[in-house]
Amino acid sequence: GSSFCDSKCGVRCSKAGYQERCLKYCGICCEKCHCVPSGTYGNKDECPCYRDLKNSKGNPKCP
């Protein structure tokens, strides 16, 4: 990943229960959207692309 995504996702996932999984999905979403919401959760309206990405089951993909 890029240093932008790594640093943003490091913050985003700092309190996640499953750190590696959080970082993986955050990284995928960041690469696609070039945006990661601030804070450790919520604030997804800052990044509509990130907010609206869904996985194959139709659930939100991005942490």
Swiss-Prot record:
The superkingdom listed in its UniProt entry is Eukaryota
Q: In which tissues is it expressed?
A: Expressed in peel and pulp of fruit (at protein level).
Pfam families linked to this entry: GASA (PF02704)
- Indicate whether Metal-binding appears among the record's keywords: no
Instruction: Please give the InterPro entries that the UniProt record associates with this protein.
Output: GASA (IPR003854)
Tell me which UniProt keywords the record has, alphabetically. Answer: Allergen
- This protein is called Peamaclein
- Record the organism: Prunus persica (Peach)
